[in-house]
């Protein structure tokens, strides 16, 4: 990240802290670690996780509920991706002049398990129709 090796926690935390109005995370493989990365997000920022919550070690409702109780200032919602995403990305401040997009090699739940890349993509306009479609998707219901 920023042309240097960093810990996954530092990278995610530094990206999320830059948000002014919203954070969108598109990642089909979410887990408790995904939520932990978001815990220091700025107060008042709306966070949406887009995921189909697939694979082993899925995020469960009890983990989500406990996280929300422990971090009540984190405004977090979830929507389905609809099974069409392989890549993972983060969108900060969608639809504003400050919009930024980051492409993430590894799933956020596995961040720190090995070397991966997170890069900023400066061609943000190509993501507008993708995010507009995702925002119309139904709410993700987590397993018990």
Question: At which residue positions do the language-model features occur?
Answer:
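Secondary-structure "cap/kink" motif recognition
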Residues: 15-20
């Amino acid at each position: 990240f920023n042309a240097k090796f960093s810990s996954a926690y530092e990278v995610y935390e530094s990206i999320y802290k830059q948000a002014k109005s919203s954070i969108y995370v598109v990642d089909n493989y979410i887990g408790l670690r995904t939520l932990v990365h978001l815990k220091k997000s700025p107060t008042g920022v709306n966070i949406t996780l887009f995921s189909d919550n697939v694979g082993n070690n899925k995020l469960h409702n009890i983990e989500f509920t406990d996280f929300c109780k422990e971090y009540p200032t984190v405004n977090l919602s979830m929507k389905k991706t609809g099974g069409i995403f392989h890549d993972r990305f983060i969108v900060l401040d969608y639809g504003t002049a400050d919009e930024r997009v980051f492409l993430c090699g590894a799933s956020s739940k596995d961040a720190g398990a090995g070397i991966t890349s997170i890069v900023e993509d400066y061609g943000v306009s190509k993501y507008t129709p993708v995010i507009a479609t995702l925002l119309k998707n139904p709410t993700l219901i987590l397993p018990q």
